[in-house]
């Protein structure tokens, strides 16, 4: 969704940034994990397919995807590289385009060291707030 292409959401534990082509190699690496494939009901994709998926998510009017970054790592770096801070992703799927207040949020904390630390909870809360604010702004 182009709506979030220039958006950064800063929480206490996580930073949400738009999913761009620079994130694809790390994301693809995560999705080679059989555990993550099982937990997310995903099929393994080639790197080229992963790039195509990222492009389609960016263009779809009913999807909004952010990469979840570890805020502590991101803020500690003099020049933060997002790839080194990646923890997972969060998605908003609009389930009824006639009523954009209806949707589904999915969160994946792919980095094992980031699990159990509240990253998923904060990412979901930031996404709910962003979705509500974006809806209000578009009316």
Task: List where the protein language model places each region.
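Conserved acetyl-CoA-binding loop-helix of GNAT-fold acetyltransferases
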Residues: 116-130
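Extended, charged alpha-helical interaction scaffolds
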Residues: 135-139
């Amino acid at each position: 969704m182009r709506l979030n292409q220039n958006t950064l959401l800063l929480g206490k534990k996580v930073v949400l940034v738009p999913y761009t082509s620079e994130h694809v190699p790390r994301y693809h690496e995560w999705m080679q994990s059989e555990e993550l494939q099982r937990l997310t009901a995903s099929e393994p994709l080639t790197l080229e397919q992963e790039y195509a998926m990222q492009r389609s998510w960016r263009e779809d009017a009913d999807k909004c995807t952010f990469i979840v970054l570890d805020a502590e790592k991101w803020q500690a770096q003099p020049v933060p590289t997002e790839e080194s801070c990646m923890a997972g992703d969060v998605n908003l799927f609009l389930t009824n385009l006639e009523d954009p207040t209806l949707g589904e949020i999915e969160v994946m904390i792919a980095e094992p060291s980031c699990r159990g630390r509240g990253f998923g909870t904060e990412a979901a809360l930031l996404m709910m707030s962003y979705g509500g604010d974006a809806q209000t702004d578009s009316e």
